[in-house]
């Protein structure tokens, strides 16, 4: 049979189906003539007990509608998501009753024009109240799309068994779709068509059945125009019903695909099975898990960064703490050093203060020794004057023999004067030893002054004991003849503890001394002369030249010293050897006074020119010798700079510090 004939038969079948049901929406049509015989036969043929399937499947596979029935799948089953899984809200496939005459519910037949205009419409008739209830739940239909897949019952999750269904499309191209049977049995389309033989078919049904029986499993009909639809990827049931004969479809395109009649296709996510929903949920959860893991990794990385930053901050803090502790320790050490330095400074100050005190005490001791030396010199001068006066008294006594008694008394006192001079010499030697002693007490000065006062009083006794007028007459004669230099001494002391008590002591000592009663003059005259001389001696002895400081005094002793020139030089050399006191000589040079007999000339050179020339030119000789010896470049020179300086000091300085005093007569 050619393809043209087959296409004609298909058009007839489609036209009959279109006449039966042109719309998916069920319409109740009252049929007044319904044969009861066919209804009874239908009830006998399809009892619920004979069907191995469920009650719903026995209704769906009723043999009374086998000839002209065409199974349809709701339009919701053809909507799937991007994974190819059908929706979960799809209903199980239902069959449209082929015989409208035997069904109480029918559809209005349409004309051929409606058939050509609406090829995508599929009629569906609900069987009984269950089918009508299903259609009430799904009032809206969709357009059958090409390449539709087999739908699964929503009761597949509960374990119900759905029969294999084959849908024959009424559009221009027919596609065969195989459904998976999740039950233990599978039915073929041929079996259902053979079962429908019990009902008296119409002539059109006979042609359709004969066509299906003729080519149930012929391999010639299964060519590329017949292709099974791809099963669902999410269904885990075994592929049952694959042995059923495929439904023929025509390789063509829809003539009016874009005519949706105002019906919008629903979202594919609304038509997923629970398993597919689980898979989608798992996918979403996996994506969320990945996102949470990514966030977790980010948080962990941030935590690690914060931990590393915290570790760095901790290290920095520890380092700063170490620096701070080191600084504190260094500060403590510095404070300790400062304290030690302060202690050292205090000790140095105390030691310096002690040294200053010692130096001041040393200066005081030096001044005390100076006072002792001054008093010693004065006592020596007084003793020498007394010895000269004793000699004059002796000469005068030899001239007057009647005065033997005073002469004897004078001789008796003369050894005392000589012994006094020896005692003064010994005291000078002792004072030379006491010059280097810096710890001498200040009380020694008072003792020495008392001793000097006693010696002076003894000297004055000799003066008073001698006849005053004769001695005074003889003294200028001798001094004029022999050309003796007369000098007035004035020695200033730095600190002399002068008080009225000392002067009173001296006066009392002098008053106790008796003058000599064996003078040639009368006692009244001698007493008057002695009193005059006593007052003059006291006034000459103690004279205050510094009224600004009442505790310091200058001892001025105008004593006439009749010497010869050689005796004067010998006495000066003896004093220089014993004392070597240059300051005293300088003070003597400053205190030279002019007298009425003549003028005193200050000279720094000696009377002999050769001596002065030798004193100046003597250091030149070792200097020249030293210069030649150093330029000669030989061994060690005979003279060095030390020898030169020593020679200069020995030769020149000793001669220069000796001073001679001449008086023009």
UniProtKB/Swiss-Prot annotation:
Q: Which InterPro entries match?
A: Syntaphilin/Syntabulin
Q: Where is the composition biased (Basic and acidic residues)?
A: 1-22
Q: Where is the composition biased (Low complexity)?
A: 35-52, 61-77, 141-162, 225-245
Report the coiled-coil segments.
275-357
One biological process GO term for this chain? regulation of insulin secretion involved in cellular response to glucose stimulus
| Superkingdom assignment | Eukaryota
Q: How does it assemble?
A: Interacts with STX1A and KIF5B.
What does this chain do?
Part of a kinesin motor-adapter complex that is critical for the anterograde axonal transport of active zone components and contributes to activity-dependent presynaptic assembly during neuronal development.
Its protein name is Syntabulin
Q: Which organism is it from?
A: Mus musculus (Mouse)
Q: Which gene encodes it?
A: Sybu
